[in-house]
Regions:
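Catalytic or ion-coupling anion/metal-binding cores of large enzyme and transporter domains
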Residues: 1-46, 55-73, 79, 85-90, ...
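Acidic/charged coordination and interface sites in well-structured regions
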Residues: 52
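Glycine-/small-residue-enriched capping loops at alpha/beta junctions
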Residues: 49
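A short, small-residue-rich loop immediately preceding and capping a beta-strand
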Residues: 105-126, 138-141
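Glycine-rich, highly charged phosphate/nucleotide-binding loops
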Residues: 90-99
């Protein structure tokens, strides 16, 4: 067994005393050295408890004869920065987390790594970082928070806030929702970006089977963290199995099929391609569209479904989803257990995993005085909620590279429609118009210059919630943007419109009262008329050419700092918006 940590000790005589000064004992220096990297911090509930899991990981490492060193790079919370310029830092923070993992791992020799995070940018940042570092690694998902009273979950706050702004509820009701929506640590309890990415980590084979989206307060999660520590040492000692030995294009295809089955966040179209890029694998929006077509949508969990995210684990989690779609999966892919996916699934059927999950489901039933079964949460393949996946990539003269819609969260009435354009150059202007009832039935509301190069690609969460929570507008208008949406967003919202406005994409050329065609079934997104009148496609092409000649590029929004760097080098949203150099 050749360990890089021991080779470096021979080359750098100061390494041992520096580690002893940090608290290592002399006998620790010759052990397998594992970097335990987490997003622990007081930044939000998804990271606030990770220090507890870190210590369990270190115990597991020690049990296998290794030593775990703690490294931290906390993440920010989209929910805490919503509605402010702080949200512009969100996507860029993913790159910085990956960069810090690279720096931590490569500046100091380690034989293996364990990575812990729960939420939107922490999970993909960790997965990008572990791919880049490529030492034997295990990822530990931080789990989900519990639901509150009346099964209240955080994604409902946007609805409550919009109702309050419209005078539909009083301040007392809004305050009740605020005080009860986050009753514990963990990721927000719906299938938003955080939950989706935890599930993707397991589906890729980088987390232990069954570990994604456990309740963060569960003792099961502590044991999984400890086992992840043990497994990291085993991988370093016995197989030196690296992430690049595990993750293949077939792994990503499995993950995307799971994404379809859970109706996962559209932000995965930013994160999975960026993770794949670090592995030297190319996936795009077209990959998602191909695999989602005819795929089964099975999960009845919020925001598209009825139940909070903790129910996902109680119903059997990722393994239960994979069992239902097994005939479409690559079962021979390798996983972090050192076994294939097919071997893992068979083992879980025989080791009491599903029986343990069901016991937790019965406890949940008692808590809320209901009688849920596994099949109420995860449908069978033959009784699927939907049979065309959960997202679609729309293309046309408005989005030549593509735009994404989560059609499972969109009213069927909007699947084929022609609307009147109402363009806005910032979310603030658009939200103000929606709340003041200046947007009408039949409008297509545009928010542009909010892509990666424009402003950092923030979420349009408040605007989408204001629209979807309005009984009239939620079924009669669309929101189209080169920005993105929260994983909690519902309604007729189309994001990632590419090329983005700042690059002169067609979304920058849209004018008031252009006619906008949306066709989810045929995957079309086109400008089909101007000033409220239909035109031929040849006429539209000519008009867009004239508008392009008159269009003037905007001055860069940022002149210094992280967002200047990100806006200069971010790739197209359809490629993953990672940094291109």
């Amino acid at each position: 067994m050749c360990l890089v940590s021991q080779e470096m000790r021979k080359l750098a005589p100061e390494l041992d005393p520096l580690r002893i000064g940090t608290g290592w004992k002399k006998e620790d220096l010759g052990k397998v050295q594992v970097m335990v990297e987490s997003t622990y911090g007081d930044s939000h509930p998804g990271s606030g408890h990770l220090n507890i899991l870190v210590e369990e990981v270190r115990k597991g490492i020690a049990e296998e004869g290794g030593f775990g060193a703690r490294y931290f790079c906390t993440d920010i919370c989209d929910g805490e920065s919503q509605g402010t310029d702080g949200i512009n830092y969100s996507l860029a923070s993913r790159e910085m987390i990956a960069n810090m993992i690279e720096i931590h791992a490569n500046a100091t020799p380690f034989d293996a790594g364990v990575y812990l995070s729960s939420c939107d940018k922490g999970v993909p940042g960790n997965l990008m970082g572990l791919a880049r570092v490529n030492i034997p690694s295990v990822f530990v998902p931080g789990g989900t928070m519990n639901a509150g009273p009346e099964m209240l979950t955080l994604e409902q706050l946007g609805m409550y806030s919009a109702q309050y702004e419209r005078g539909e509820i009083d301040e007392e009701k809004l305050d009740w929702a605020k005080c009860n929506a986050c009753p514990s640590c963990g990721a927000c309890s719906f299938i938003g970006t955080a939950s989706t990415l935890q599930i993707m980590a397991e589906a890729l084979g980088l987390a232990l089977p069954g570990s994604a989206l456990m309740p963060a307060t569960s003792p099961d999660l502590l044991e999984y963290a400890k086992e992840a520590g043990r497994q990291s040492v085993r991988l370093a000692k016995m197989k030196n199995m690296k992430p690049s030995d595990i993750v293949t294009i077939e792994s990503f295809e499995n993950a995307i099929l799971v994404h379809a089955a859970i109706s996962g966040s559209t932000n995965c179209l930013l994160h999975l391609p960026a993770i794949a890029h670090e592995f030297g694998i190319e996936i795009t929006g077209d990959t998602f569209d191909r695999l989602h077509r005819n795929a089964r949508y099975l999960l009845d969990v919020r925001p598209a479904g009825r139940w909070p995210a903790e129910c996902f684990y109680y119903a059997g989690g990722v393994p239960a989803i994979m069992e239902e779609i097994k005939q479409h999966l690559h079962l021979d892919v390798m996983t972090v257990t050192g076994k294939t996916l097919g071997e893992n699934l068979e083992e879980l059927k025989n080791n009491g995993f599903y029986e343990k999950c069901d016991k937790w489901l019965q406890e949940f039933n008692k808590r809320y005085n209901i009688n849920l079964t596994k099949n109420d949460i995860i449908r069978s393949y033959d009784n699927a909620i939907g049979t065309d996946g959960s997202i679609a990539i729309l293309k046309g003269n408005l989005a030549p590279e593509g735009a994404v819609i989560k059609h499972t969260a969109c009213p069927k009435e909007m699947f084929k429609s022609v609307l009147h354009a109402r363009p806005f150059d910032s979310e603030e202007e658009c939200l103000d118009a929606v709340l003041k009832h200046k947007v009408q039935k039949g409008d297509a509301v545009f928010i542009r210059y909010e892509g990666p190069k424009g402003s950092g690609m923030p979420e349009m969460f408040y605007t989408s919630e204001a629209i979807s929570s309005d009984k009239e507008l939620g079924k009669s208008i669309a929101l189209i943007t080169d920005g993105r949406f929260s994983g909690a967003s519902t309604g007729p919202v189309i994001g990632h419109c590419s090329p983005e406005a700042v690059d002169g994409g067609p979304i920058a050329l849209v004018e008031e009262d252009d006619l906008i065609e949306i066709d989810v079934i045929e995957r079309k997104l086109n400008i089909v008329g101007v000033k409220g009148e239909r035109k031929s496609m040849e006429e539209i092409d000519r008009i867009l050419q004239e508008r392009r000649i008159a269009w003037k590029p905007r001055k860069p929004k940022y002149e210094k700092g992280v967002l200047r760097l990100f806006s200069q080098h971010a790739a197209s949203p359809m490629k993953g918006a990672y940094l291109e150099y």
